[in-house]
Amino acid sequence: MKDDLRKIDKILLFLVTLMCIFGLVMIYSASSASTILRYYVAPNHFFVRQLIVLVVGYVFGFFVILFPTNRYKFLAYLYSLFVLVLLMYVLVKGKIAGNAQSWIAIGPFNLQPSEFAKSALILFMAVFYNNLSKRNTKNLSLYFIPLLLAGVYMLLTLLQPDWGSAAIIGAIAILTFLSVPMIKKNILKIMKIFVIGIIVLALALLYKGGNILSSNKLSRLNFKAPCTRYQEESGYQVCNALIAISNGGLFGVGLGQSSQKYLYLPESHTDMIFPIICEELGSIAGALTILLYGVILFKIFKIAKRSDNLRTSILAYGTFWYFTLHIFINLFGLLALIPLTGVPLPFLSYGGSYTLNAIFLIFVTERVAIENKKNKLKREIMSI
């Protein structure tokens, strides 16, 4: 046990923990007004709930670190099936909030199955492709099975509807799929299949697009200046996010002194927490936050590159894409560069289901780092 713990990537774990602590501070600050004015609860309500989730996540993560990835086989398939059942259940018995039926109420907490679908998909792909590589099969059609699972996850998530999570599930599946060696060798054949798929999807959208996309969703594709669109109501959130960033200047107005959190900026403690950081602590703090994300992503990518088997490689690459997609979609959305979809910012945004999955994947990556070092040591001993 001690030997395993010594092999973790200490810098990665330190940076993630630092971001989580910073996130707690900003969640308390960003939600201090809305807790009283909107939710009618104590000012520390979301802070305490997030702290509980983090403690649970880190305790569970300790066991994840000690659990070898070669034992994921049955658990990955069982986890994927369990998430599939949850995604179907939420459509029937789920809690409706924010025009989406995406949550399952469990006591005082709400479970969001679409968040667990992301980590379940990564584990499923890692185990499935690793098993397939051992069979040395050249049947390309078998490699598309995880994409079928991703498609089912996406469809069930779209029915809630949760466009942001559905897009990330699909993107994780495709980007991880393209990192498989067998797929890289047959990239031209694969691209032909993707082109056909895109054409079919485009025709389906042309035929049924009006029924799939509501006027609210279509309005988010309007990229003219968000504060001009504010008069049409579709640019309200982005406009107030940009106002918050502008208010902060270089050094900010001071911790806890945001004016936009007084219900001007909806969900300021969740997917809109970055503008509050910039308003209270300044653009310099915002830039440092992005820099820390860059270092975390670099560390995860290095762990993926050092993996010497397909299972651990896909686990780390899947985690890399998971965080990269969340960071870029969140930041690009609030800067009006892409449609706003309500995607949380890793380690900073409030959210139990997302935080648990983010922490879980970090500790899975730490387990991969441990196994990388163990395998390297074995090779060195054998070469003597």
Residue map of PLM features:
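Hydrophobic alpha-helical transmembrane segments
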Residues: 52-60, 280-297
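Hydrophobic, glycine- and aromatic-enriched re-entrant/interface helices and adjoining loop segments
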Residues: 97, 103, 189-285
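Hydrophobic alpha-helical segments of polytopic membrane proteins
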Residues: 77-84, 140-156, 163-209
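Loop-to-helix entry and N-terminal half of a specific, functionally important transmembrane alpha helix
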Residues: 302-342, 348
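Interfacial segments of multi-pass membrane proteins
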Residues: 167-187, 256-285, 344-359
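Alpha-helical transmembrane segments of polytopic integral membrane proteins
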Residues: 21-27, 122, 126, 294-297, ...
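Alpha-helical transmembrane segments of multi-pass membrane proteins, especially transporters
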Residues: 142, 146, 169, 244, ...
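Membrane-helix boundary/helix-loop-helix interface segments in multi-pass membrane proteins
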Residues: 2-12, 18, 25-28, 33-160, ...
